[in-house]
Amino acid sequence: MKRILIVTGQSGSGKSSALQVLEDLGYYCIDNLPLALLPEIVAKLDHENNLEQLALGVDVRSTRADMQEFDHVFEQLQKHGTVDVIYLTTQDQDLIARFSASRRPHPLANRFKSLLQCIHEEKQLLIPIQFCATVHIDTTDKSVHDLKHILLSKLGQSDNLIVILQSFGYKHGIPLDADYVFDVRHLPNPHWDLELRRFSGLDEPVKQFLEASPQANEMFEDILHFLKKWLPAFAEGHRHYMTISIGCTGGQHRSVYMVDRLKQALEAEWSVQVLHREMKHWS
C-alpha cells in the first residue's frame, strides 16, 4: 500500500466531505472506525487487496483511552505505507452555525451540555491526534469546492511546490492553516473612499488607487523578495504546498489586491493557487 490517510478533526468541520473528495480521487475510504481496530483492518486490507490509496475516517466517538494510544496506532500503520494525518478544524461560531443548519446533534451531546461545551470538550479529546497531524486544514468559511481545491493542492503527488495565496479579513479571524501571514492593514484603505468601497482588489479602480501608494508598492516588493528567496528552499525540503495568507481589515480590497499582484509575479515560476476567503462578504 503506497499511501494511507487518516482524516479526522472536529465534528462538523467537513470530515465526511473530505472523504467524498478523496473517494473521487481514487482512495478506498472507510469511515467511523474505532481507533483500536485500525492496525488490524489495514493489515488485512494490505494483505488481501491490491490497494494503493486508503483513507480512514476517525472521530471523537473512539474511547478516550484509544485517543491516548494514537501515536502507537500511527506507528503500526506506518508498516503498511506512507501515513498522513489530515486534521480539520473550524472556528467555534462556524461549527455552531453548521450544527444549527443541519439540526444534527453533536456526537458528545447530552441534555446536560451546551453545544459550545461539546465543541470545547471534543477539542481536548482530539489533542493526541492533532499532535500527530501532518496536514492541518481550517475549513472556516470554506465550501466543499474550496475543500476539494485545498486537498488537491496539499496532497499533490508531484514534487513541485504549490503556492497557495490566500486573502482574508482580520475581523473574520486569522486562517489557522497559514504557513506565513502578512498584515497589510497599514496600507491606504479604499473602503473609506465611497466610490471605491463597492469594488474589490480585483477591480481596476482599486488597483489604480493602491498602485499610487508608495507604501503598497514597497510592501509588495518586500513580500515578493521574501517569497522568491525562500520558496526554492521550501521546495528542496520536499514540501508539496505552502500557504501564504495576506490580511487586511475586511478581506475585500488591500489583501485581495496584494494576492492578485503576487500571483501575477510568481506564476511564471511556480504553480500558484488563489483563495479569496472573504469573497462571500464582499459588498
From Swiss-Prot:
Q: Which residues cross the membrane?
A: none
Please tell me whether the keyword ATP-binding is annotated for this protein: yes
The superkingdom of the source organism is Bacteria
Q: Does the entry feature the keyword Nucleotide-binding, yes or no? A: yes
Q: Where is the signal peptide?
A: none
Which UniProt keywords are present, listed alphabetically? Answer: ATP-binding, GTP-binding, Nucleotide-binding
Q: One MF term in GO for this entry?
A: GTP binding
What function does the entry list? Displays ATPase and GTPase activities.
Question: Which positions in this protein are listed as binding GTP?
Answer: 59-62
**Which organism does this sequence originate in?**
Acinetobacter baumannii (strain SDF)
NCBIfam families membership: PRK05416.1
Binding-site residues for ATP, renumbered to this chain: 9-16
Name the protein family: Belongs to the RapZ-like family.
Name under which the protein is recorded:
Nucleotide-binding protein ABSDF2931
Alphabetical list of InterPro entries matching this protein: P-loop_NTPase, RapZ-like, RapZ-like_N, RapZ_C
